[in-house]
Design a protein with these regions (language model features):
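Conserved catalytic core of sirtuin-type NAD+-dependent deacylases
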Residues: 1-128
Length: 128
């Protein structure tokens, strides 16, 4: 195991640029519900086609807006965790060397201080 860690450290030290791929697992540690967990996931309570489609928005815009407002409110109660903070600190110490590519829409990487974040699915903090 130590050899593996030493090799990883060496790769990171010599890399010109590092891309970190992030998903639901990192934010689950902060208490953000995932979409896929069978018992507690967001889709355990709602069907995607009822809230997360253009057709749903056209039929029941108030329901969709309310659902997103509820999600935004729940995110206001959570904080970035050690994983988010470690990535932000790495970026601070090594400017221009780290990009976080995330599927998450919670904005916790940005709240932790990460600047170079590509949010593949957008952000609940921004309406488009």
């Amino acid at each position: 195991m130590e050899d593996l860690l030493a090799r990883a450290r060496q790769c990171l030290q010599h890399a010109a640029h590092i891309a970190v791929l992030s998903g639901a697992g990192i934010s689950a540690e902060s208490g953000v519900p995932t979409f896929r967990d069978a018992q507690t996931g967001l889709w355990a309570r709602f069907r995607p086609e009822e809230l997360a489609t253009e057709d749903a928005f056209r039929r029941h815009p108030e329901r969709v807006w309310d659902w997103y407002a509820e999600r935004r409110a729940s995110l206001a109660a959570v904080q970035p965790n050690a994983g988010h903070l470690a990535l932000a600190e790495f970026e601070r110490r090594h400017p221009g060397r780290l990009t976080v590519i995330t599927q998450n829409v919670d904005g916790l990487h940005q709240r932790a201080g990460s600047q170079d974040v590509l949010a593949l699915h957008g952000s609940l903090a921004e309406d488009r």
